[in-house]
Amino acid sequence: MKTSFLDFEQSIADLEAKIEELRFVQDDSAVDISEEIGRLEKKSGQLTKDIYAKLTPWQISQVARHPQRPYTLDYLSLIFTDFEELHGDRAFADDHAIVGGLARFNGQPVMVIGHQKGRDTKEKIYRNFGMPRPEGYRKALRLMKLAEKFGIPVMTFVDTPGAYPGIDAEERGQSEAIGRNLYVMAELKVPVIVTIIGEGGSGGALAIAVGDTLQMLQYSTYSVISPEGCASILWKSSERAPEAAETMGITAQRLKTLGLVDKIVNEPLGGAHRDHAAMAQNLKKALQDALKQLSGLSTAELLATRYERLMSYGRFKEQAVS
């Protein structure tokens, strides 16, 4: 698949286009220009490294939303085996914005749950753009309770702009469904490992993000509202989204500094969308480490540690400036 470049990557896009042009010429010519191609590839790599070393929070949010970024189902095929998808909330419907089911992780049974966006227009509509309705969260809840019943770990993958705000979702109890998940996840008697793989938007993300370990991919985001939404509320203009992104502290690095995130999983140069396989390997290693650490805890220790973790949120110290 040809890489789609973001606005701030235009200089990289120009170089890559030139490289592709030279490759095409070399295929149809006896002239050896591999040295020139190699030089440009090296230059493109260095340029990408320089640009990504100083991304702004707004630019990071654009990378987190990249249409070619790997989604939950991509990681399921790259990291897990024997995946068996489970459908429906047993109350209303099967929400396609959330996928989940039983799988094996290095041979060990686990329950995997995650948001799922779409690639093309048809799939985006089918997945409701990754915005779950109440039945999606109730499906996730059903699977988590099933995991607890069988004593297997839960791994969740968060990637949503937020819970669906439609009237039908509100009528079916959107806020109750989210709140119920928070309540139950806080007391699940099995390890829960949460990974923010793209956008972590508001309560729609939080509803499957309460756990023992919270990790974020390097260029993912996690916030109470989108930068555009924040700008529209505070300044009545979505054009100030870059300023809102900076103010809210939505990046993995910022959230780790605040103690809200346990681990940042490095992405390949240029973002996860550049190399799905490499990203999956990095994430698999992070999941292995987290599961190994949690597997050594008794149920009582697991719950006590989780409670202490949740109660630490929101604590901070103020220091007077003389």
Curated annotation (Swiss-Prot):
Its main location: cytoplasm. Keywords: ATP-binding, Cytoplasm, Fatty acid biosynthesis, Fatty acid metabolism, Lipid biosynthesis, Lipid metabolism, Nucleotide-binding, Transferase. One of its GO terms (cellular component) is acetyl-CoA carboxylase complex. It is found in: Cytoplasm. Belongs to the AccA family. The lineage of its organism: Bacteria, Pseudomonadati, Pseudomonadota, Betaproteobacteria, Rhodocyclales. NCBIfam families: accA, AccA_sub, PRK05724.1. It catalyses: N(6)-carboxybiotinyl-L-lysyl-[protein] + acetyl-CoA = N(6)-biotinyl-L-lysyl-[protein] + malonyl-CoA. Residues 39-293 form the CoA carboxyltransferase C-terminal domain. This is Acetyl-coenzyme A carboxylase carboxyl transferase subunit alpha. InterPro entries: Acetyl_CoA_COase_a_su (IPR001095), ClpP/crotonase-like_dom_sf (IPR029045), COA_CT_C (IPR011763). The keyword Magnesium does not apply. Component of the acetyl coenzyme A carboxylase (ACC) complex. First, biotin carboxylase catalyzes the carboxylation of biotin on its carrier protein (BCCP) and then the CO(2) group is transferred by the carboxyltransferase to acetyl-CoA to form malonyl-CoA.
